[in-house]
Amino acid sequence: MITLYEAAIKTLITHRKQILKHPDSREILLALGLYWDKTHILVKCRECGKMSLTGKHSTKCININCLLILAIKKKNKRMVDTLIRMGADVTYIHLLKNKIKLSYNQLSMLKSNSQISLKELHAICYLLYGRLPKKIKQGMQLCKTMAGLCGELLCAFLAP
């Protein structure tokens, strides 16, 4: 069963070209841990399984564990969380020794936390809703809850 967070991330990555056209999207993606810096979105290469900027194989594909080490050094907890969810190996924490305060146990806790906060859910909804075509917006039923709205938005984007 896919979690709401994973579905939202999948949707955002799949439709990244549309989403990145809007300048405010970059800041939201950065806060959600889906952006490495202000120019690169995290996407897994389909061929080698490493991280790439386009999702296609190239010489610029980066090992996910190298990105994890950089994220830990930058103390970017959201990025660490995202990389672990994408398959980074938490045992690489030993390479950092005393350079950071995060322990192996803290990283393991991040991996098991699949909940999404209300603030993150709102940001995802805002991103998705703002990028929907007008026809779909008009056809959507009004939802009373934020979770219902997010579900409707994800269905609209994930539908074939």
UniProtKB/Swiss-Prot annotation:
Biological role stated in the UniProt entry: Plays a role in virus cell tropism, and may be required for efficient virus replication in macrophages.
Q: Which organism is it from?
A: African swine fever virus (isolate Tick/South Africa/Pretoriuskop Pr4/1996) (ASFV)
**What's the name of the protein?**
Protein MGF 300-2R
> Into which family does the record put it?
Belongs to the asfivirus MGF 300 family.
